Amino acid sequence: MAKMQAKVQQDERDDGLREKMISVNRVTKVVKGGRILGFAALTVVGDGDGRIGMGKGKAKEVPVAVQKAMDEARRKMVKVSLKNGTLQHEVVGKHGAAKVLMMPAKEGTGVIAGGPMRAIFEVMGVTNVVTKSHGSTNPYNMVRATLDGLQKMSTPGEIAAKRGKSVEDILG
C-alpha cells in the first residue's frame, strides 16, 4: 500500500476554528473480485485558545475522507489550559510505541516541533514550546501521544486543590 504525506493545509471557516490536515493514506480492501481502493485522512482542529480535537475519516475519495475527519475533530474537542502561549509544565505523552516529550519555552522561542506535533500546537494557539519525539513516527501515534500528554497537564490551581494547599505554597 502506498502512503502519501499530504501538505499541511489550513482552512479558516466562519466558526473561527483552525483546521489542519496531517496526513492522507491510500488504503486497500482485498475482496473476491479484486482490490477496493479508499483513502484515510487524519486532521486536527483548534480554536487558537487551547481547545484541540483530532479526527480520522475514511472514504472512497480524498475530499470526503478529509471532511469526515474534520467533522469528527470538531465533535471531539477538548480544552487544555495554557500559560502565556506555552505549556504549564514539562509533560510526557505516550501512545503505542510513540513517546513525546513537551517542554514549555520562554517568549521568542517559537514552536520547535516536528511533523504532526507542530500542526497540533499551531491550531491550539501555542506560540512557544520545545518538543522531542521518541519511538514511532507514525502520524496517528504521534498525534495521540501529544494529546495524551496535553490532557495529563495540570494547572497550579488543580495541584494545590489536590494537596489541600494554596497556589502560593505550590509556586513557592
From Swiss-Prot:
Keywords assigned: Ribonucleoprotein, Ribosomal protein, RNA-binding, rRNA-binding
Gene3D superfamilies xref list: 3.30.160.20, 3.30.230.10
Domain (S5 DRBM): residue spans on this chain: 17-80
Any one GO CC term of the record: small ribosomal subunit
A Pfam entry, by short name: Ribosomal_S5
Single biological process term from Gene Ontology: translation
GO molecular function, a single term: structural constituent of ribosome
Subunit structure: Part of the 30S ribosomal subunit. Contacts proteins S4 and S8.
Record remark on domains: The N-terminal domain interacts with the head of the 30S subunit; the C-terminal domain interacts with the body and contacts protein S4. The interaction surface between S4 and S5 is involved in control of translational fidelity.
HAMAP family found in the cross-reference section: Ribosomal_uS5_B
Function: With S4 and S12 plays an important role in translational accuracy.
Family stated for the protein in its record: Belongs to the universal ribosomal protein uS5 family.
Protein name: Small ribosomal subunit protein uS5
Gene, per the UniProt record: rpsE
